[in-house]
């Protein structure tokens, strides 16, 4: 479900009139009967001002589609910002942008795709923003039949508009290269670079047609658990882990390696309600530990 959708021209006007955050808030209440927290409202006002700067270019068609807060089906996750249109050869393109208000980030060694940053009142391990954008795009593509039938190409990226890159840049260290290649990271002072990234894919407006295709796409049936586990043990990727799932997975892997090294037993209890992805974490761990010879 898309919370807010409009043309690029609609979005620019709403930001100019200081109404965009209110429009999103009202739509969320209308569609989901949920009140918006003040910090979330402020984050929209802040981040969307930066997206205004990025999109305020005549080379990006005024009738391109803009979506804000797209709820990924079968998950509780939301894509922050989407812009849609056609490329030079009329190929359908959708740019997915993960917006972050972080101003400091630390690399996390020894755990795939994790970084440390201040969030939720403390410094925590979270997924790298490039991994987050890439995994959201992969999830949408895997489960939305319109994406595959319409040959819609997804272009994920992350925009950390409060964060200034350093030299060497922590978010672009060797351990993150694979994810940054698939989903580039743009930081404070790089609005023009993000604009160029969008302009490469969106040259002709789609009048929101691609947003409609995404929002109305038929959801593919869930994969067979038995077949998926067999495929994963053979080295194939079947279930993509999102956000906290990836963090928990990496923490358990770290603990498993510690147990192998010091020969001590440890128990990890993963709590979560229905649909939070405990099974996804478990089968990814089963496949990984089996392939690494760590599963007894």
Predicted feature locations:
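Accessory nucleic-acid engagement/destabilization modules that flank
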Residues: 1-215
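Conserved adenine-nucleotide phosphate-binding loops and their immediately adjacent elements
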Residues: 220-245
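N-terminal pre-P-loop "Q-motif" helix
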Residues: 237-266
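Hydrophobic anchor at the beta1->P-loop junction of P-loop NTPases
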Residues: 270
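The conserved Walker
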Residues: 274
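Conserved lysine of the Walker
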Residues: 278
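Hydrophobic positions on the alpha1 helix immediately C-terminal to the Walker A/P-loop
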Residues: 281, 285
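Post-Walker A helix-loop "phosphate-sensing" segment adjacent to the P-loop in P-loop NTPases
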Residues: 287-295
